[in-house]
């Protein structure tokens, strides 16, 4: 991964969205139908400079170096709550300000606003988007141990204190309602629900969070885990005047690359001089059949090495959030977090954050609802949403291209399932579907799995 590390060192990161007004209200994406009212709402918010974080400033919750020893001593005398791997990932998210202006695990009022309104109302009356609950569950025994204490210490599975939660509030964990409102179904088999909710405690504890030191995973990828503040600093060094974010949890194929390069071309046509792509793979919990993070990062490296994406205009960084697979509800969180990292444009595709129905043979969400919801979501008015055109393999040109409905017979749609099947069988996709180096990484990954394995490496957690 040395070469991609060099890319990062050469590629400053963008954080506050840089925007410019467009007298013709031209959209910075190719021939996408978009309601004129929504179009005016988005383009009208364009202005110069990196976009400000939600609430006006990043809320970073890491204790300053001189106070860390003292805080660790304090933690030793407080009631203890042990965190799961996913709890630690959410602590990481909170600590760096991805959820700004949230200052800790949610209290009940914040939880209810998130469930019912997908937003939080701030003291000044303004509204910021918040579509997924960031909460910490405890059981009856832990609740009893806490008693009347107003503070608790959070510990990792190794027994080390990692944070202090103060001015706490404990309230009921309405699991069924949480699941129904977040996913739109209570069907069995939802990956995040099975992992983090079903067996969680019946109480939630919220409060003000102090994280005792920066979160590290020691997995060889920490250099890619740039905080919103670090992204902003690097992007400002680059003098980027637009930042367009692309979230993914899958390997990059040439269709993705086409969408990203076409977006940059459109931004240049709008008059921007130095638009920067934030390629931002999700680094938290993912379901069992997704390619693990370390292999995805190897694959992304090859995409840059092979010149599919330009290293000079691409920033690769890891987004630490766990994945819900909650479709239009979750995609709002993905977009909101990128505002805090400085992105003013967000690329959204077909069925973002979606998955197949866990019981029935159909998609869980309408494929178009994600981009439609983003165009209307409360608190996302400052973010320019870029729905992209459908890309498929053009058999006449031997490459990925935008789908032309006038000649559908010329196009081949290669699904994720088909891609995985080809890689597992050590077969090659059509030339032009993915760069050879990137495809080899996928083949190597599937070859590394034992027949008895479940296709997953152990979950990486902070240490």
From Swiss-Prot:
What function does the entry list?
Mediates selenate (Se) reduction, and promotes Se and sulfur (S) uptake and assimilation.
| Residues annotated as transit peptide in the record | 1-48
Intrachain disulfide bonds: none
Q: Could you tell me which CDD domains the record lists for this protein?
A: ATPS
Catalyses:
sulfate + ATP + H(+) = adenosine 5'-phosphosulfate + diphosphate
Q: Under which EC number(s) is this enzyme classified?
A: 2.7.7.4
What switches on expression, per the entry, is described as:
Repressed locally and systemically by phloem-translocated glutathione (GSH).
Q: What are its GO cellular component terms? A: chloroplast; chloroplast stroma
UniProt source species: Arabidopsis thaliana (Mouse-ear cress)
Q: Which GO terms describe its biological process?
A: hydrogen sulfide biosynthetic process; response to cadmium ion; selenium compound metabolic process; sulfate assimilation
Q: What is the lineage of its organism?
A: Eukaryota, Viridiplantae, Streptophyta, Embryophyta, Tracheophyta
Q: What is this protein called?
A: ATP sulfurylase 1, chloroplastic
Q: What is its main location?
A: plastid
């Amino acid at each position: 991964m040395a070469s991609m590390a060099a890319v990062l060192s050469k590629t400053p990161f963008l954080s506050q969205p840089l925007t410019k007004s467009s007298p013709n209200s031209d959209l910075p994406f190719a021939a996408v139908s978009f309601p004129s009212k929504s179009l005016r709402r988005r383009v009208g918010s364009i202005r110069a400079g990196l976009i400000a974080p939600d609430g006006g400033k990043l809320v970073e919750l890491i204790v300053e170096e001189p106070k860390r020893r003292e805080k660790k001593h304090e933690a030793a005398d407080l009631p203890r709550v042990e965190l799961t791997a996913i709890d630690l990932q959410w602590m990481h998210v909170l600590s760096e300000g991805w959820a700004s202006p949230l200052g800790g695990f949610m209290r009940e009022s914040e939880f209810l606003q998130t469930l019912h309104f997908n937003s939080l109302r701030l003291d000044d009356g303004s509204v910021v988007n918040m579509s997924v609950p960031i909460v910490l569950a405890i059981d009856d025994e832990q609740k009893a141990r806490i008693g009347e204490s107003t503070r608790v210490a959070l510990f990792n599975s190794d027994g080390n204190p990692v944070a202090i939660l103060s001015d706490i509030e404990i309230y009921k964990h309405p699991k069924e309602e949480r699941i129904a409102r977040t996913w739109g179904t209570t069907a069995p088999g939802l990956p995040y629900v099975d992992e983090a909710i079903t067996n969680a405690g019946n109480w939630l504890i919220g409060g003000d969070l102090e994280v005792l030191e920066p979160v590290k995973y020691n997995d060889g990828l920490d250099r890619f885990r740039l905080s919103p503040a670090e992204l902003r600093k690097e992007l400002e060094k680059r003098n980027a005047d637009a930042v367009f974010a692309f979230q993914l949890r899958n390997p990059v194929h040439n269709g993705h690359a086409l969408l990203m390069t076409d977006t940059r071309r459109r931004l240049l046509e709008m008059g921007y001089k130095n638009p920067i792509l934030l390629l931002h793979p999700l680094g938290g919990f993912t379901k069992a059949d997704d390619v693990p993070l370390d292999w995805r990062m190897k694959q992304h490296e090859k995409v840059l090495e092979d010149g599919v994406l330009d290293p000079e205009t691409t920033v690769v960084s890891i987004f630490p959030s766990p994945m819900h697979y909650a479709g239009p509800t979750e995609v709002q969180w993905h977009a909101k977090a990128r505002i805090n990292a400085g992105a003013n444009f967000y690329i959204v595709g077909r069925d973002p954050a979606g998955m197949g129905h866990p019981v029935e043979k159909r998609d869980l969400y309408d494929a178009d609802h994600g981009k439609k919801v983003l165009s209307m979501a409360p608190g996302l008015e400052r973010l320019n949403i870029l729905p992209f055109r459908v890309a498929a393999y053009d058999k006449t040109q031997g490459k990925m291209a935008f789908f032309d409905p006038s000649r559908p017979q010329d196009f081949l749609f290669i699904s994720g399932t088909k891609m995985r099947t080809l890689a597992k069988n050590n077969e090659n996709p059509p030339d032009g579907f993915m760069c050879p180096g990137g495809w080899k990484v996928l083949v190597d990954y599937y070859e590394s799995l034992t027949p008895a394995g479940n296709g997953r490496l152990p979950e990486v957690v902070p240490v």
